[in-house]
């Protein structure tokens, strides 16, 4: 997702410098062009050669390279950098950057950069919590830096507390959020529902469906990467929630109805991808229902229709998208649903089509709007999510 992007990775002199090598590796695996600058003290913990082998680029330390090209090296690098990430960042380098000191290759280059900047402090807990360090981090935030909070745990010095460098995969998510996709949803609020609901019969059993939640989670993640502020209301799933997304866990159809209704007004885009139960047991048994001879009939009652509620309580300018999984008459049923629910778009798929079933990482979707139907090919769910977001934005612009 980072093809064509250049990240300047600054590595400073702390024990966590070894993690920067793994970070460089995960960035390269995302097809990112990685340039590394180490401080002199960082070379006491890890060698420039390590980064050169991982990135395929020369790792820099000295400001004055005797083999420089006709361009001033730090200025040339600053011009081609899309994002700066200093990880790990010592208290010393945090102070330098906060006060504009430029006495080595790293600080000189960063001072010339006009791109987004991230910094991940990593140090002893006492150093991190020192008011001077906190003031310096606040100053960096004032100047537009995003400060990545350190993890807590046992530190190399033996102390326990905040100060650990987050794992490379976590740092990667910060980079992806900044660079992976254009931020065409910046300033927009997106509400997504995902997953199944569970309708309890007794303390042991419940009614549910096969929904994995993958489509809704993909929409939430892609909307986040495109700059939106995302709320994901999720039924029970085995999925890891997308980073930088507010997640509201629910269980039953009634739980989901209440969570959606409470948040509808603030949303600019709503994607109701959850497979919500249409019926719930009319009666709940406080004790386990015991097996008896003969058949058992369980009366069911209708749940509240969330999409119908959204369509009848929409505010001007709000774009609402529903989902429809069918086994027959997909177009006719989905077009009728579009009108009945008073929504802007229905994403329809047929369970019997290969690649469009439950639990898979692909989907075959038809986007149905008042203007017509657009059939999409077999796509990954993240690709399908982006096409759905594109269509929703086009509807908002009309």
Spans of features found by a protein language model:
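A cross-family phosphate/adenosyl-ligand binding-site feature
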Residues: 1-119, 124-398
């Amino acid at each position: 997702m980072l093809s064509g992007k250049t990240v300047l990775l600054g590595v400073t002199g702390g024990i966590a410098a070894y993690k920067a090598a793994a970070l460089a590796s995960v960035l390269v695996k995302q097809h990112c062009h990685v340039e590394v600058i180490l401080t002199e003290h960082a070379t006491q913990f890890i060698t420039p050669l390590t980064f050169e082998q991982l990135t395929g680029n020369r790792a820099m330390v000295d400001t004055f390279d005797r083999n420089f090209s006709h361009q001033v090296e730090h200025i040339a690098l600053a011009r081609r950098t899309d994002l700066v990430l200093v990880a790990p960042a010592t208290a010393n380098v945090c102070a330098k950057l906060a006060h504009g000191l430029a006495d080595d290759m790293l600080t000189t280059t960063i001072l010339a950069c006009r791109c987004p900047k991230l910094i991940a402090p990593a140090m002893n807990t006492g150093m991190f919590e020192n008011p001077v360090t906190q003031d310096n981090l606040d100053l960096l935030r004032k100047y537009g830096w995003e400060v990545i909070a350190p993890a807590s745990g046992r530190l190399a010095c033996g102390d326990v507390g905040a100060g650990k460098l987050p794992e490379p995969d976590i740092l990667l998510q910060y980079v992806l959020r900044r660079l992976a996709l254009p931020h065409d949803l910046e300033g927009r609020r997106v509400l997504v529902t995902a997953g199944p609901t569970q309708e309890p019969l007794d303390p042991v059993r419940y009614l549910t469906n096969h929904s994995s939640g993958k489509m809704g989670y993909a929409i939430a993640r892609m909307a986040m990467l495109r700059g939106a502020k995302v709320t994901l209301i999720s039924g029970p799933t085995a999925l890891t929630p997308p980073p930088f997304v507010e997640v509201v866990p629910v269980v039953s159809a009634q739980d989901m109805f209440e969570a959606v209704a409470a948040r509808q007004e603030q949303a600019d885009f709503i994607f109701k991808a959850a497979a919500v139960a249409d019926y719930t047991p009319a009666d709940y048994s406080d004790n386990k229902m015991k097996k008896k001879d003969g058949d058992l009939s369980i009366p069911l009652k209708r749940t509240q229709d969330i999409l119908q509620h959204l369509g009848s309580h929409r505010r001007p300018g709000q774009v609402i998208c529903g989902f429809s999984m069918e086994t027959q008459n997909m177009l006719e049923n989905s077009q009728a649903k579009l009108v009945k629910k008073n929504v802007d778009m229905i994403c329809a798929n047929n369970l019997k089509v290969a690649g469009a079933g439950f639990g898979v990482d692909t989907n075959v979707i038809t986007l149905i709007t008042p203007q017509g139907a657009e059939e999409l090919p077999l796509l990954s769910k993240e690709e399908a999510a982006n096409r759905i977001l594109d269509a929703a934005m086009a509807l908002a612009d009309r």
